[in-house]
Amino acid sequence: MSKRLENKKIVVTAAGQGIGRATAIAFNNEGANVHATDINDQTLETLNKEYPNIKVKNLDSTNKKAVEGFSASLNQVDVLFN
């Protein structure tokens, strides 16, 4: 397993299932510091149980104030996968 994304902070939206979930897992496997967002708590909880290194956050990306607050809490992001 390569660690070419080690020390990179990556946000993946819609990460609860499908392409978003697969992408979050792939980035995690490459050593990234992954922050996964979705509006479905259940799928996020499952993702976090299977991959405890992935940080999960219930976030509605259509809510501008919520997104701004989340972004501010992260300080710097290297990659945003939407």
Residue map of PLM features:
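Conserved glycine-rich cofactor-binding loop
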Residues: 9, 14-18
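Structural signature of beta-strand start/N-cap positions in the alpha/beta core
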Residues: 9, 33, 55, 76-78
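Rossmann-fold scaffold of SDR-type NAD(P)-dependent oxidoreductases
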Residues: 13-14, 77-82
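N-terminal Rossmann-fold cofactor-binding loop
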Residues: 14, 37-41, 61
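Aromatic pocket-lining residues of Rossmann-like dinucleotide-binding sites
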Residues: 27
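Conserved glycine-rich Rossmann-like NAD(P)H-binding loop of the short-chain dehydrogenase/reductase
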Residues: 30-46
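The beta1-alpha1 cofactor-binding region of Rossmann-like NAD(H)/NADP(H)-dependent oxidoreductases
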Residues: 57-69
